[in-house]
Amino acid sequence: MSNKAWGGRFQSEPEAWVDAFNASINFDHLLIDEDIQGSIAHATMLAQQGILTEDESNTIIKGLQEIQQDYHDGKIEFTEALEDIHLNIEHELIERIGAVGGKLHTGRSRNDQVATDLHLYTKKAVKEIIHLIHTLQETIVKLADDHVDTIMPGYTHLQRAQPISFAHHVMTYFWMLERDKNRFEDALKRIDINPLGAAALSGTTHPIDRAKTQELLDFAALYENSLDAVSDRDFVVETLNDISLVMIHLSRFSEEIIFWSSDEAKFITLSDSFSTGSSIMPQKKNPDMAELIRGKTGRTTGHLMSMLMTLKGLPLAYNKDMQEDKEGLFDAVHTVTGSLRIFEGMLASLTVNTDRLNETVHQDFSNATELADYLVEKDVPFREAHAIVGQIVYWCIQHDCYLLDVPLEKYQEFSSSIDDTIYSYLKPENCLKRRKSYGSTGQESVRHQIKVAKDLL
C-alpha cells in the first residue's frame, strides 16, 4: 500500500520526479495562514456539532497554531512528497499530536479546503490592492492640487493638440484608478463567499454547520450549490482581470512618465531614488521603475489569459488543472501591489518643471483651435474658419514662427474679421480660462474636479 494520504488503493509509490511534477507546495505554501485559519474554523465547528470533543478540537487548534508559528520562525520545511500545503500541515499535525490530528479532515475534502484558502487569500489581497489604489489616488490629488495653474501641451496621436492644465492631465489617472477601485470593491461580493463544507463535490453526511464556519471566517455568504463551491474560479478570473486593468493604467501613466522625463521633453525630473544609471554611459539617468511597471503589465495580462484557457474546457467538479490557478494569481498580486507602491513613491517624489512646460506650450500650434473659435465668434462658419487657420499655420511653418508672432496685417490678409484682440485670445493661459464646460481643463472646472475627488477619498 502507498504511504500517501490517498494511498489505500495503490500498491506502489510514485517516482520522485512524478511527485515533483504533481506537487504544488513550492507555491501554495503561501496559503499557510489561510489554510490554518480555515482548519481552525472547521475544528471549532466540528466540536460545536459534537463531531469532535472539545478536548480534541482544542488539541488540534493548539497544534495548528504551533505549526503556523514554527513555520514563520523557519523551523519547519515542507516536502514535495506530501504534495501541497494541506497534506504537509496535516502530516505535521499528526506527527505532533497523534491520531487525533487525522480527525480534522472529517466532513472536509481538499477540494473545499483549497477553495476556502483561495477565497480567504483573494479577499485579503483585494483589500490590500484597494488600500494601495486609494493611497496612490491621494498622491495624484495632491500633485494636481499643486499644479492647477501649470499649463502643458495636451496631445493626440503624440502630436501637440491643445493647451491643458497639468492637473487636468494627471487627474485623468485618478478617475481610471477610481474605476479600478470600484471594480475590486464589486468583485468582493463574489470573493467573499464560503465554500467550506461542500466537501469533494456533493456535501457531506456529517452534521456540519456551514453557517458557523461562514461566521468564524467572516464570509458574507455561503455557496448555495456544493458543485459550484468547489468548481468556481470565476473570482480568480475576475481578480486577474481587475489587476490587469490596474496594471494597464499604470503602464499608460508610466509611458508618459518615461516621455516627460526624457531630454526631448524635460517636463518632469524623477527622483534619484526611483531612477538608475548605466554601466557604460556615465551621464545616464534611466526611468527604470516606470519601464519595469510597463513591462510587468504583460505578465499580469498573461496570467489572466492562462486562467481563462485553463477553465475553458473543464467539466464539473474539481480537476487537477485547477492547481494552475495559484501561481498566476500569486504572481499577479505580488506584481500589482509592488507596482502600486513603487508608482506612488515615484509620483510623490518627482519634480514638475513648470517653466519648461510653459516654454513648450508657447512654442507650438496648440492654440490653433482657439484661433478657429475666435473666428467663429466673429460669425465665420466653423468649416471656413478651420480652413483659414490651416492656411495661417502653413504660413507660420514656412516663416518659422508661431501664431502669437504673426503680424496683424498678415492676419488680416487671411481674414478681415481678425483684429488686435487676437493676441490676448491666443495666450495659452487664456485658452485655459475660457474652458468652462463641466469636466474641462479650465482652472475652475479642474478645482471642482479635485474637490469631487477629495470627497470620494
Curated annotation (Swiss-Prot):
Q: Which SUPFAM superfamilies match?
A: L-aspartase-like
> What is the first-listed, main subcellular location in coarse terms?
cytoplasm
Q: In which pathway does it act?
A: Amino-acid biosynthesis; L-arginine biosynthesis; L-arginine from L-ornithine and carbamoyl phosphate: step 3/3
In terms of domain of life, where is this protein from? Bacteria
Location relative to the cell: Cytoplasm
Q: Which reaction does it catalyse?
A: 2-(N(omega)-L-arginino)succinate = fumarate + L-arginine
* Listed HAMAP family: Arg_succ_lyase (MF_00006)
By sequence similarity, the record places it as follows: Belongs to the lyase 1 family. Argininosuccinate lyase subfamily.
Tell me the protein's name: Argininosuccinate lyase
